[in-house]
């Protein structure tokens, strides 16, 4: 069969790498792709939001399955566009992708269906938000309602900071229309865990847990980013947590969306906070996480195309997901200065060191070919270096060793990805 992936980041490279291993797939395309994806797929120069061209291309090439990676096209109706043209596509329709595209929608859904989450209020006017902050307990969390590249969440320790945050989101429009409406919610403490799942509209199958590192600098300092590294599984995601979430979070979310007439097919990524009073939902994403995908898919044993098709066909109940009994760590190599100002166009050396290295992977997030055919940097997050190991500590050691194999002019990384592994009472 012929498959088209929409996207061009590290997440899509991991998906493309996984799809390329399926014996079912004879031809793989990716639009727009990147220099790493070009190793496993034919890259097509069409932007992720250019639905007309994407649908036309899929029609011309007789594509059997489309996989939409990023949140923006999903929220804007990419799946609807392919479906309307009679093309099989994996991902949620626009009316279901709202689960991620509107924080206010997801909070209201959780409240209505008693899915555990932080207490919150929603505001459309900065004046009302500021008035509310006069008496609200600190610290507090502000969230832009719309999509903001994973950066639209502000944790404010003081009232002054919170008021400044309202100004940033609603008046200065740092994230554009995403901040027209904001959610203000109570600050929760605990361990954060990400859990990825496949959904076919009624059945949900949990993949495995992971833990992201959002801040740009070591020690969880600096600005929020799209993610600087991750590990899987999370040692804090215990059997007790899993049992609780299956009963009160996972299936109830799928059932709630169905009850609202917004049947969800695709990936639901649950951002959880493990609080003293039990697990609570921090956020939903309606797609694979980035860089979580880069540690989850290398551990997955299934043919991913089988799972994609089962989600599209509503037969996910017949699939048993299987994961290796090991661990993986991904360290993101970024351009120095990310997520603010950084230079691009540096030549990347050493990528061939990963060829034939079992258990070591380099997933390209921001790379392209220059006019001489060299692979150069082309984004804030450039590469995700993933390594597996029998334990989390071994995987972490392997991942950091592999970061030394590649070089580019302004290479930057966090040196403490997976530090929480050392904080676990039990040896993984």
Residue ranges and their predicted role:
Residues 246-268, 285-357, 370:
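Active-site "cap" helix and flanking loop/linker of ATP-utilizing ligase/carboxylase catalytic domains
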Residues 153-293:
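Internal nucleotide-binding/catalytic subdomain
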Residues 43-49, 121-125, 156:
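Short acidic-hydrophobic, aromatic-tinged amphipathic segments that line or gate anion-handling sites
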Residues 367-372, 376-428:
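Generic C-terminus detector
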Residues 20-21, 36-38, 60, 90, ...:
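Solvent-exposed alpha-helices and their adjacent loops that cap or buttress functional pockets
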Residues 1-94:
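ATP-binding N-terminal substructure of ATP-dependent carboxylate-amine bond-forming enzymes
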């Amino acid at each position: 069969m012929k498959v088209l992936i929409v996207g061009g980041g590290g997440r899509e490279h991991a998906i493309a790498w996984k799809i390329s291993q399926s014996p079912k797939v004879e031809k793989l395309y990716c639009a727009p792709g990147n220099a790493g994806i070009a190793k496993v797929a034919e890259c097509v120069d069409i932007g992720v939001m250019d639905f007309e061209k994407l649908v036309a291309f899929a029609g011309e090439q007789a594509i059997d399955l489309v996989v939409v990676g990023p949140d923006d096209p999903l929220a804007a109706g990419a799946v609807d566009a392919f479906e309307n043209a009679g093309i099989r596509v994996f991902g949620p329709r626009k009316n279901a992708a709202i689960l991620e595209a509107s924080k206010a929608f997801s909070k209201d859904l959780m409240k209505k269906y008693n899915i555990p989450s932080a207490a919150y209020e929603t505001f459309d006017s900065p004046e009302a938000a500021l008035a509310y902050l006069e008496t609200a307990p600190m610290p507090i969390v502000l969230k832009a309602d719309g999509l903001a590249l994973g950066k639209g969440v502000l944790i404010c320790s003081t009232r002054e900071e919170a008021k400044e945050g309202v100004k940033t989101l609603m008046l200065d429009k740092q994230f554009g229309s995403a901040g027209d409406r904001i959610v203000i919610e109570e600050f929760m403490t605990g361990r954060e865990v990400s859990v990825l799942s496949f959904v076919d509209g009624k059945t949900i199958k949990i993949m495995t847990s992971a833990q992201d590192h959002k801040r740009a600098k070591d020690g969880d300092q600096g600005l929020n980013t799209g993610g600087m590294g991750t590990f899987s599984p999370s040692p804090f995601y215990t059997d007790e947590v899993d049992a609780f979430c299956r009963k009160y979070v996972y299936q109830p979310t799928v059932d709630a969306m169905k009850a609202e007439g917004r049947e969800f097919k695709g990936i639901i990524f649950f951002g959880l906070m493990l609080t003293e009073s039990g697990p609570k939902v921090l956020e939903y994403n309606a797609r694979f996480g980035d860089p979580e995908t880069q540690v989850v898919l290398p551990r997955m044993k299934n043919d991913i195309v089988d799972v994609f098709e089962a989600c599209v066909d509503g037969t996910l109940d017949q699939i048993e997901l299987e994961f290796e009994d090991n661990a993986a760590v991904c360290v993101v190599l970024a351009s120095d200065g990310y997520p603010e100002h950084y230079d691009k166009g540096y030549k990347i050396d050493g990528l061939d060191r990963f060829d034939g290295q079992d258990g070591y992977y380099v997933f390209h997030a921001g790379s392209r070919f220059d006019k001489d055919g060299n692979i150069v940097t082309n984004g804030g997050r450039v590469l995700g270096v993933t390594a597996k190991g029998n334990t989390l500590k071994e995987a972490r050691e392997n991942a950091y060793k592999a970061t030394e194999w590649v070089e580019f002019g302004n290479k930057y990384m966090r040196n403490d990805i997976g530090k929480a592994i050392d904080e676990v009472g039990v040896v993984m």
